[in-house]
Amino acid sequence: MKLYGSDFSPYARKARVLIIEKNIDCEYVADDPWAADSGIPAKNPLGKVPVLEIAPGKFLFESPLVVHYLDNLEGKPLSPTDAAGYWQSQWWQALGNGMIDATIARILETRRPADKQMPEKMRREEARIARALSSAGGEYAGGEFLVGKKLSLADIVMGVALQYVDIRYPHDWRSGQPALAKWHAGITARKSFLQTMPAGFTRVV
């Protein structure tokens, strides 16, 4: 099994963290989908990462599907098995994925020529991130993990999302959410996060 992804992609990183946490035998292959010689479009018609090759010539794509497949390998998912815990985990994942989407939308706007940038769009994405942080802080009940008493996909997705905010939209969100910041410091100290941190960036605590 092979996972194709970009080192800077938070979508691929979710899968990479999960692979390490579950000790899954899966080769990681770095492939920038923006490169002219990228092999990603031949594996995923949408041209995005991550792409998971589950058998020769058989590919899964889109991070929710890839993560769901990996999490359910060998019948030992990190996702809670009780209904309440499962849907709570899904809530956190939706919030984290939305934060990633907003952060990417903001950074893409900043890369446009200065005379073509839309400040109102940047402010809208920043407001989405701020509301998500406030919602996360209000929902977090304390403890080592977001849902229950063990690591779940909620921790992985939110951990990656908040660290992506640190990388692509660095600002002091921690002073307003000290409890969430403490949780994040603990999660991102795990081997899976340290080993998948994009080169050139330092973990913020």
Q: PLM features: what roles do these ranges have?
A:
Residues 1-123:
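GST-like domain detector, emphasizing the conserved glutathione-binding G-site
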Residues 175-205:
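Long hydrophobic alpha-helical segments typical of transmembrane helices together
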Residues 71, 161-162, 197:
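Active-site-flanking alpha-helical
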Residues 67, 71, 90-93, 133, ...:
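Non-transmembrane alpha-helical segments in soluble domains
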Residues 96-185:
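GST-like fold's C-terminal all-alpha helical module
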Residues 20, 167, 189:
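Short polybasic/polar patches that bind polyanions
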Residues 52, 64, 129-132, 137, ...:
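Aromatic-glycine hotspot motif
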